[in-house]
């Protein structure tokens, strides 16, 4: 089964907790702190695997969680960090944040990797908090939570050439005779319901990847028929072969078909029309095909000014294997002078600070009032400090209180009208405000 979209949730591993320990050995009085740091949590990483062709692996397996780091140990030893969770994805996978819709990465190179959820750092052990004023601290940090996010995956197959056209114009037959691909072929519309990919080799030795895409109909750009499900796969192609049935066997007008398909391509993505097109006049072995082709050329020429260059037209018969060599040679020549089309600019990608730090202008905290009159503190930085505080140790709690004071939380609460004894809430944790 071909699957080109998927939704998954990923959760990186939590960092291991730091340890509170003291050196207790014979003949070593006042041994001091000896608790080590926790290990780093595993990150979740997507890696391109050329052997994959669809997102089928994500149909039933949609949740991925990396392991947490180990806790710090005595003798100042660090906990073992967890290995990263590597998830294989097919070449051509675009990854978006499901909540913001921002593109995180576009994975197109074999072996390319991208960290979609960063593992939490390990909490510091009490050996890290020793100072001349406090040589035996009973403070250790909890491990930092790993990142967690919902992702949308979209596969856009990598092909140099894309075959487009109405259903039953002979796209699958063309692919089957110029490559070793074996697409499903039938005498009815929408025989092809998934993209097919084949490698084409010309007589001069040039080779390129060709994709046979399901037939388009009017309204495809709005989702009619197979619509946008497969229009996305045209986006990575560099050259479009527009296949037209010149036999007009079903009473269709070849030129009207040509105009209709181009309108759908333009409506879906204006940049698709920047790609060079070759018109493939198929089924030329059928009666009246030559007359239809002549009429088509006249109608096409009427739409172009004298100084404009007309698209190349190649009369062929896929079934009779006629005209194929010249078509393939021309396609290879056009590919050689056509650069790749970038799907995304740098501005399209989510900024790195969303993963690895805080923006300079980011608010450290926010204060709101709950229905029960409690003061609610929130903010990514504040909440991160809170979850890394070991609430079982008085010194850790006092350290967190000093951090809040240093961030200006106490002063901000006073300005908002907080009084002695008011309830202050962070997540599910509550404490009394002391003025």
Swiss-Prot record:
Cytoplasm found in the keyword field: yes
Keywords, sorted A to Z: Cytoplasm, GTP-binding, Hydrolase, Magnesium, Metal-binding, Nucleotide-binding
Matching PROSITE patterns: G_OBG (PS51710), GTP1_OBG (PS00905), OBG (PS51883), OCT (PS51881)
Root EC class: hydrolase
OBG-type G domain: residues covered: 159-336
Domain Obg: 1-158
CDD domains: Obg
Keyword Lyase: no
List of residues binding GTP: 165-172, 190-194, 212-215, 282-285, 317-319
Primary localization: cytoplasm
Binding residue positions for Mg(2+): 172, 192
Cofactor(s) listed: Mg(2+)
EC code(s) of this entry: 3.6.5.-
Family: Belongs to the TRAFAC class OBG-HflX-like GTPase superfamily. OBG GTPase family.
Function: An essential GTPase which binds GTP, GDP and possibly (p)ppGpp with moderate affinity, with high nucleotide exchange rates and a fairly low GTP hydrolysis rate. Plays a role in control of the cell cycle, stress response, ribosome biogenesis and in those bacteria that undergo differentiation, in morphogenesis control.
Known partners and oligomeric status: Monomer.
Protein name according to UniProt: GTPase Obg
Organism in which the protein naturally occurs: Streptococcus equi subsp. zooepidemicus (strain MGCS10565)
